[in-house]
A protein has these predicted regions:
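Plant-biased, solvent-exposed loop and capping regions
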Residues: 1-969
Length: 969
C-alpha cells in the first residue's frame, strides 16, 4: 500500500516534469516565431523607401505587435496581417515575405512599388487576402499564386503587369474576388476560371485580353459581378452566361463581340446592370429582355442593332437608365413605352433612325430627368404640355426635323439645365417665358429658322454659361441687360440679323471665354468695358460694320488666343490687341488700321495665322516675326509696307501661305525662300523687287501658287521651276525676265494658269507647253520677243479658256490644231507676223484677235485674195448653218403665202359651183373690180396682170372679210 502510494507520487512527478518541458518548448518555439517575424520584417523594411515614415516605429526596441500596419494573433505570438495601403512607400516587394508563414492578409495597395511580384509569395499557405493594386508593378503574374489554396481575395489591378492570366488561378478553390483590371494583360481567359465555384466578383476590365469568353464560365455559379469591358474579346456571348443566375452586374462594354444579343440573358433575373456598349452586336434587341424585372441600368449603345424599339419601361419597372444610342433602330417609340409612376430617369436614343413625332408617351415618365433623342428623324411640333416633365434637367433634341415654335410651357420646367434644339427647323420667336428657367445652364438653338429679337427676359436666366444662336434670323439689338449673366462663358450669335452696338454691360460677363458676333449688321465701337473680360480667349466680330479705334484697355486681355475683326471699319493702331502672349489667330483683314506692325506680336509663340491685309499699315516687316516658328499663314498684302523682307522669316519653317503682294517692298528675292519647304502659296506681286528669281524656289515642292508679277525681276526663269510638280498657278507678268522658257516647265503638269506676259522672253514657244494639258484659266505669253511658229502641240490644251500670244514676233500659219480648242473663250494672236488661213472655228472671235499680222485671212478677216474658188466658198459651220436657215425660212414663208391664196381661191370656186346648180351664170368680182369666169380654165389673171414675187408676197390677198361678195342669196 505504501509502495503503491510511493509509485504514484513518482509518476505524478514525472508527468508534471514532462508537462513543464513541453510548455517550455512551446513557449520557446512561439517566442522564436515572434522573433523570427520581426527579423524578416526588418529585412523587408530595409528594402523599402519610406518618405512618409510610415515604418518609423519598426524597431527591435519595440514590440512587433505595436508596429504600424501590423496585426498580431490573439496571443501576440506571430503576425497575421500587414496593411501598408497608401503609406507612400516605394521599392520592390521582397521575397522575404515568404517567411511570414502565419500571414493571412497582405495589403500593399496604393503605393509606388515597382518590380515584379515575387514567386515566393506562393509560399504563404495561410494567406486569405492579397491586395497589391494601384502600384507600378511589372512582369508576369507568377503561376505560384495558384498555390495559395486558402486565398479568398486577390486584387492586382492598376499595375503595369504583362503576360497572361496564369491557368493556375483555377486552383484557388476558395477565391471570392479576383480583380486584375488595368494590368496590360494579354491572352485569353483561361478555361480553368470555371473551377472557381465560390467566385463572386471577376474584374478583368481595361486589358488587352482577347479570344472568346469561355463556356466554362458557367462553372462560377455564385458569380455576381462579371466585368470584362475594354478588352478585345470577340465572338458571341456564350449562352452559358444565362446560367449565372446570381449575376447582378454584367459589363462587357468596348470589345469586339458580335452576333446577336442572346435571349438567354433574360434568365438573369437578378441582373441590375447590363452594359454591352461599343461592340458589334447586330440584329434586333430580344424582347425577352423585358423579363429583367430588377434591371436598373441598361446600355446597348454603339452597336449595329436594328429593328424597332422592343424594350418597354412598362415591364422594366425598376429601370432608371436606358441607353440605346448609336445603333440603327427604326420606327417610332411605342405608345406603351412608359406608364405613370415610372422610375425611368435617363433615356438616351441618340443617333439612330427613329422617326415619328415627339413621343407623347414620354410625358408619362414623370421621373425622367434626361432625354436625348438627337440625330434621328423625329418631326412635327413639340407638345404644348411638355412642362409635365417637371423633373427634366436635360432636353436634347438636336439634329432632327422638328418644326414650329418653341412652346411657352418650356419656361415652366423649372429644373431644366440644358436645352439643345439645334439643327432642326424651328421657327418663330424665343418665348419670353424662357426667362423663368433660373437653373438653365446651356441653351443651343443654332441652325434653325427662328426669328425676332433676343428677349430681354433671357438675361434673367442667371445660371446660363452657354448661349449659341448661330445661323438663325434673330434681329434687333443684343439685350442691354446681357451683363446680368455673370457665369456666361460662351456667347455665339454669329450669322443672324442683329443690329446696333455691343452693349457696354457685356463687359460684366467676366467669365466669358468665347464671343462670336460675326456675320451680323452690328455697328458702333468696342466698349471700353471689354477690358473686364479677363478670361476671354476668342473674339470674332468679322463681317459687321464696327468702326473707330480700339480701346487701349484691350491690351489687358492676357488670355486671348483667337481674334478675327476682319471686314469691318476699325481704324487706328492694332497695338491694343497685342497684350496677350497666347495668340494663335489674329485676322484684321479689310479694315482701316494704320501705323506699324507691332514687333511684340512675336511674343505669341503659338501664333499660326497672322492676317493684316487690306489696311493702311506702314513701316517695315518686323524681323521679330521670325520667332513665330508655328506660323503657317502670313498675309500682309494690300498695305503700304516698305523695305526688305526680313531673312528671319526663314525660321518660320511651317509657313504655308506667304502673301506680301500689293505693298512697296523692295530688294532682291532671297535664296532662303527655298528653305520654306511647307510653302504652298507665295505672292510677292505688285512690289518693287528686283534681281533674279532664286533657283532655290525649286525646293518648295509643295508650292501650288507662285505669283511674282508686276515687279522688276530680271534674268532667266530658273530651270529649277520644273521641280514644282504641284504648281497650279505661275504668274511672272510684267517683269524683265529674258531668255528662253525653260523646257523643264513641262514637268509642271498640274498647271492650270500660266502667265509670262510683258517680259523680254525670246526664242520659240516650247513645244513642251502642249504637254500641260491641265491648263485651263489662261496661257498668256503676250508682249514678249517670241519668234518662230506657233507649235501645233498647243492644240492639246483642250481645257484652255484664254490663249494670248499677242505682241510677239511669231511667224507662219495658225496651226489647224488650235481649231480643236473647244473650251476657248478668249483668243488673241494680234500683232505678230502670222499669215495664211485662220481656222474656220475661230470665225466667231472678234477682229481684234487677229489684227496687225502679215497676211492672215479668212473670217472674221477678209477672204484670202489668192484663194481658189473652193477656198473662197469655204465657210464656217456657223455661216453655213445661218445660210441654210435663211433659205429654209424664206421658202417656207413663200409656200405659206401661196398656199393661203390657193385656199381662198378654192373657197370662191366652191361658192360659184353651188350657185351654178341653180341655173345662173354668175361672175365673181375681184377686189380690183375685174371679173373671172368661174367656168373658164383661167383661174388666174392674165400674164399682163401678174405682179412680181415681192408684190405677191406682200399684196396678193383676196379680202373676203372687207369686201362683201354675195355669190348666193
Amino acid at each position: 500500500m505504501i509502495q503503491h502510494s510511493f509509485m504514484g507520487s513518482i509518476c505524478m512527478c514525472h508527468f508534471i516534469l514532462l508537462l513543464t518541458i513541453v510548455c517550455t518548448v512551446v513557449v520557446a518555439t512561439l517566442g522564436e516565431h515572434n522573433t523570427t517575424d520581426s527579423y524578416w520584417l526588418l529585412r523587408i523594411k530595409s528594402e523599402l523607401v519610406d518618405p512618409l515614415r510610415a515604418l518609423s516605429n519598426w524597431s527591435p526596441t519595440t514590440h512587433i505587435c505595436s508596429w504600424n500596419g501590423l496585426t498580431c494573433a490573439a496571443n501576440q505570438t506571430h503576425v497575421v496581417g500587414l496593411n501598408l495601403s497608401g503609406a507612400g512607400i516605394s521599392g520592390s516587394i521582397s521575397g522575404e515575405f515568404s517567411h511570414l508563414i502565419f500571414l493571412q492578409a497582405l495589403d500593399l495597395s496604393s503605393n509606388s512599388l515597382t518590380g515584379s511580384i515575387p514567386s515566393e509569395i506562393g509560399q504563404l499557405q495561410n494567406l486569405r487576402t492579397l491586395l497589391l493594386y494601384s502600384n507600378y508593378l511589372s512582369g508576369n503574374i507568377p503561376k505560384e499564386i495558384g498555390n495559395l489554396s486558402k486565398l479568398q481575395v486577390l486584387r492586382l489591378g492598376d499595375n503595369m503587369l504583362a503576360g497572361e492570366l496564369p491557368p493556375s488561378i483555377g486552383n484557388l478553390s476558395e477565391l471570392l474576388v479576383l480583380g486584375v483590371a488595368n494590368c496590360n494583360l494579354t491572352g485569353s481567359i483561361p478555361v480553368e476560371v470555371g473551377n472557381l465555384r465560390q467566385l463572386v466578383s471577376l474584374d478583368l476590365q481595361v486589358n488587352s485580353l482577347s479570344g472568346l469568353i469561355p463556356e466554362e464560365i458557367q462553372g462560377c455559379g455564385e458569380l455576381q459581378n462579371f466585368a470584362a469591358s475594354n478588352n478585345m474579346f470577340e465572338g458571341e456571348i456564350p449562352s452559358s452566361v444565362g446560367s449565372l443566375i446570381s449575376l447582378r452586374i454584367l459589363n462587357l462594354a468596348n470589345n469586339t463581340l458580335s452576333g446577336s444579343i442572346p435571349s438567354s440573358l433574360s434568365l438573369l433575373t437578378n441582373l441590375t446592370y447590363l452594359n454591352l456598349l461599343g461592340n458589334n452586336f447586330n440584329g434586333e434587341i430580344p424582347s425577352e429582355l423585358n423579363s429583367l424585372g430588377q434591371i436598373q441600368k441598361l446600355d446597348l449603345s454603339r452597336n449595329n442593332l436594328s429593328g424597332s424599339l422592343t424594350l418597354l419601361n412598362t415591364k422594366l419597372q425598376n429601370l432608371e437608365t436606358m441607353v440605346l444610342s448609336d445603333n440603327a433602330l427604326t420606327g417610332s417609340i411605342p405608345h406603351n413605352f412608359c406608364l405613370r409612376g415610372s422610375k425611368l430617369q435617363q433615356l438616351f436614343l441618340a443617333r439612330n433612325k427613329l422617326s415619328g413625332r415627339f413621343p407623347l408617351e414620354l410625358l408619362n415618365c414623370s421621373s425622367i430627368q434626361q432625354v436625348d433623342l438627337s440625330d434621328n428623324n423625329f418631326e412635327g411640333v413639340l407638345p404644348s404640355n411638355l412642362d409635365q416633365l417637371q423633373n427634366l434637367t436635360d432636353l436634347v433634341l438636336n439634329n432632327n426635323s422638328f418644326i414650329g415654335s418653341l412652346p411657352p410651357g418650356v419656361g415652366n420646367i423649372s429644373n431644366l439645365r440644358s436645352l439643345f434644339l439645334f439643327g432642326n427647323f424651328f421657327t418663330g420667336k424665343i418665348p419670353v417665358e424662357i426667362g423663368r428657367l433660373k437653373r438653365l445652364n446651356t441653351i443651343y438653338l443654332y441652325d434653325n429658322q427662328m426669328c425676332g429679337p433676343i428677349p430681354r427676359e433671357l438675361t434673367n436666366c442667371t445660371s446660363l454659361t452657354g448661349i449659341d444662336f448661330f445661323g438663325n434670323h434673330f434681329s434687333g439689338p443684343i439685350p442691354k441687360t446681357i451683363g446680368k449673366l455673370k457665369d456666361l462663358t460662351i456667347l455665339h450669335l454669329r450669322q443672324n440679323d442683329l443690329v446696333g452696338p455691343i452693349p457696354p454691360s457685356m463687359g460684366y460677363c467676366k467669365k466669358l471665354q468665347l464671343l462670336a458676333l460675326a456675320d451680323n449688321k452690328l455697328s458702333g465701337s468696342i466698349p471700353p468695358t471689354f477690358s473686364y473680360l479677363s478670361q476671354i480667349k476668342t473674339i470674332t466680330l468679322y463681317n459687321n460694320s464696327f468702326e473707330g479705334p480700339l480701346p487701349a484697355s484691350l491690351s489687358l486681355l492676357r488670355n486671348l488666343k483667337i481674334i478675327n475683326f476682319s471686314n469691318n471699319k476699325f481704324s487706328g493702331s492694332i497695338f491694343p490687341l497685342t497684350g496677350s502672349n497666347s495668340l494663335t489667330v489674329l485676322d484684321l483683314t479689310n479694315n482701316s488700321f494704320s501705323g506699324s506692325i507691332p514687333s511684340i506680336l512675336a511674343n505669341s509663340k503659338d501664333l499660326t495665322r497672322l492676317r493684316l491685309a487690306n489696311n493702311y499699315l506702314t513701316g517695315t516687316i518686323p524681323s521679330e516675326l521670325g520667332h513665330l516658328t508655328e506660323l503657317n499663314f502670313l498675309d500682309l498684302s494690300f498695305n503700304n509696307l516698305t523695305g526688305h523682307v526680313p531673312p528671319q522669316l526663314s525660321n518660320c519653317k511651317k509657313i504655308e501661305h506667304l502673301l506680301l503682294n500689293n505693298n512697296r517692298l523692295s530688294g532682291e528675292m532671297s535664296p532662303w525662300l527655298g528653305s520654306l519647304e511647307e510653302l504652298g502659296e507665295l505672292d510677292l506681286s505688285f512690289n518693287n523687287f528686283h534681281g533674279r528669281a532664286p533657283a532655290e524656289l525649286g525646293r518648295c515642292s509643295k508650292l501650288l501658287k507662285l505669283s511674282l508679277h508686276h515687279n522688276n525681276l530680271s534674268g532667266e526663269i530658273p530651270r529649277e521651276i520644273g521641280n514644282l510638280t504641284s504648281l497650279n498657278v505661275f504668274n511672272l507678268q510684267s517683269n524683265s525676265f529674258s531668255g528662253l522658257i525653260p523646257p523643264t516647265i513641262q514637268q509642271c503638269t498640274k498647271l492650270y494658269e500660266l502667265s509670262l506676259s510683258e517680259n523680254f522672253l525670246s526664242g520659240s514657244i516650247p513645244i513642251e507647253l502642249g504637254g500641260l494639258t491641265e491648263l485651263q484659266v489662261v496661257l498668256d505669253l503676250s508682249r514678249n520677243l517670241f519668234s518662230g511658229e506657233i507649235p501645233s502641240s498647243l492644240g492639246n490644251l483642250m481645257k484652255i479658256e484664254r490663249l494670248d500670244l499677242s505682241f510677239n514676233n511669231l511667224q507662219g500659219q495658225v496651226p489647224p490644231s488650235l481649231g480643236q480648242l473647244t473650251s476657248l473663250l478668249v483668243l488673241n494672236l494680234s500683232n505678230n507676223h502670222l499669215h495664211g488661213l485662220i481656222p474656220s472655228t475661230f470665225s466667231g472671235f472678234p477682229l481684234s484677235s487677229f489684227l496687225n499680222n502679215d497676211h492672215l485671212c479668212g473670217p472674221p478677216l477678209a477672204l484670202c485674195s489668192g484663194a481658189t474658188g473652193k477656198e473662197r466658198m469655204q465657210l464656217s459651220n456657223a455661216q453655213v448653218a445661218a445660210i441654210i436657215v435663211a433659205i429654209v425660212l424664206t421658202s417656207t414663208l413663200i409656200c405659206l403665202v401661196l398656199f393661203y391664196i390657193m385656199l381662198r381661191m378654192w373657197g370662191n370656186w366652191i361658192k360659184v359651183a353651188v350657185s351654178s346648180e341653180d341655173g345662173g351664170m354668175v361672175e365673181q368680182k375681184t377686189r380690183n373690180g375685174e371679173y373671172w369666169n368661174m367656168n373658164s380654165p383661167e383661174l388666174f389673171p392674165s400674164p399682163d396682170r401678174q405682179v412680181s414675187a415681192k408684190t405677191c408676197i406682200c399684196n396678193l390677198k383676196i379680202d373676203a372679210e372687207t369686201k362683201e361678195n354675195t355669190l348666193v342669196r
